[in-house]
Amino acid sequence: MRVCTWNIQLGLKLDAIVHAVRTRPDFKGLDLFCLQEASIHGGRDDAAVIAEAMGAGYRHFQATAQLARGQEQGNALIWRRGAFEPTDPHIVSLTNPVLAKMPRVERTLLRAIAPQQRIAIRAESPAMRVYVVHLDVIGFAHKVEQLRAVITDNAARPRVPLTVVAGDLNTFGPPGLQLWRRLAATTADAGLVDVTREIGRTHWTAQKLDAIFVQSGVFTSRAWTLDLHASDHHPVFADIEIGGA
């Protein structure tokens, strides 16, 4: 199972993204493509344009979370038929986490700024569940609560052999910061393994903002990125083999 997550920066360089998908071998045979900051160009969803470039065997779903400077900003999932046969995808709102669980300074900040609308896409089949997430830029404990909303949703669903949570966590700041360790502890407590933990940078600022988590039994994985200059984020890949040794 090959998974890629990529914040495509509102598709500002959509032609470069399409070129990469068509020409780079890393995208060949991709099973799941999780997109953040997907937009609409020429009346078409970015995900539709990218899926078309990937070939006839791909399907897509895109949902707008908010308008960013008047442009649609949302999440999308592209999947390869045969590798994944989901029912109709659903939206999980990440907009209203529990403020009472946050420090007072952070609660004050979040009330003062214009609210950000954030969502996760959930797609599932009897064999697999996938979440495409995009957490807020602002806030620390806020991000933990947004991610916890995904974890809570997953826990309420029937158990499946494989769950993938992938996306842009916006984890700006030193990787050893206590709050980022809290985020890592939250996912670990839920049985989610960060298969991209060895990757050092996923953004032009040289920070790691993007990740892929896996919840399963025994599995092996490897992860890598490409520096394509088609977005401010790098695409992040993981090959996951269930039952591997």
Tell me what each language-model feature is.
Residues A83-P89, A141, E145, N154-V164, ...:
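Metal-dependent phosphoester-hydrolase catalytic domains
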Residues L10-D15, S39-G43, L67-G70, G139-A141, ...:
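Acidic-and-aromatic substrate-binding clefts and catalytic sites of carbohydrate-active enzymes
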Residues L12-I17, G42-D46, I113-Q117, A141-A149, ...:
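Soluble or luminal CAZymes and related metallo-dependent hydrolases
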Residues L32, Q36-A127, L226-D227:
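Structured beta-strand-rich core segments of catalytic domains in phosphoester-bond hydrolases
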Residues R2-I8, V21-D46, I78, R129-H134, ...:
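Active-site beta-strand/loop signature of hydrolases that rely on acidic residues for catalysis
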Residues V49-G57, D153, R182-T186:
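Alpha-helical structural signal in soluble globular domains
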Residues L109-E124, Y131, D136-F140, V144, ...:
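Internal catalytic-core helix/loop-beta-alpha segment
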